[in-house]
């Protein structure tokens, strides 16, 4: 659909801080996996921190990204020759030169991500009913998101993608900060 073309074009050309609000059923995680694969096709050294509301949902996009790379005609031979090292929580694309920081690190928003480095921090549906039940829970989520500042290298991009679930949504706050 045309809306997906608009989304991938926007993902490529957006600014360093961005927020993509999508309705349920949009396919945002699938679009994000395709975008991630394209980023790795462009640069084997690109590093993504992908965070979801919990580990297992973050791992889905990590696995989807790897599957796109393994199946796409432009990357499947490259992936088969080099064999991406790692597992769903973190892995390196063939040809990545940073041995310490993986190409893809996937984790839940409350997981420990310290000592990592990334060129892009993705927050995919981190705001869900379970973690916004009260002001304290929402503040904890915002605190954990603030840790990304210490992981993102200078010039890194930060993306928030999801569907708002509360009147004082994280996505509203990100847009007030000047996000694309």
Can you describe what each PLM-predicted range is?
Residues 1-180:
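Short, flexible loop motifs at catalytic/binding sites
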């Amino acid at each position: 659909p045309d809306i997906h073309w608009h989304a991938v074009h926007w993902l490529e050309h957006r600014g360093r801080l961005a927020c993509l609000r999508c309705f349920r059923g949009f396919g945002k995680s699938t679009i994000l996996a395709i975008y991630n694969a394209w980023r790795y096709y462009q640069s084997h050294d690109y590093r993504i921190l992908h965070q979801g509301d919990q580990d297992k949902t973050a791992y889905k996009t990590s696995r989807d990204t790897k599957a796109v790379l393994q199946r796409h005609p432009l990357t499947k031979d490259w992936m088969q020759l080099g064999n991406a090292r790692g597992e769903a929580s973190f892995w390196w694309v063939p040809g990545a030169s940073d041995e310490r920081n993986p190409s893809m690190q996937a984790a839940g928003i409350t997981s420990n991500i310290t000592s990592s480095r990334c060129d892009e921090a993705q927050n995919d549906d981190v705001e869900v009913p379970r973690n916004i039940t009260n002001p304290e829970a929402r503040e904890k989520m915002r605190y954990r998101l603030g840790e990304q500042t210490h992981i993102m290298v200078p010039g890194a991009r930060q993306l928030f993608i999801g569907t708002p679930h509360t009147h004082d949504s994280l996505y509203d706050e990100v847009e007030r900060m000047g996000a694309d």
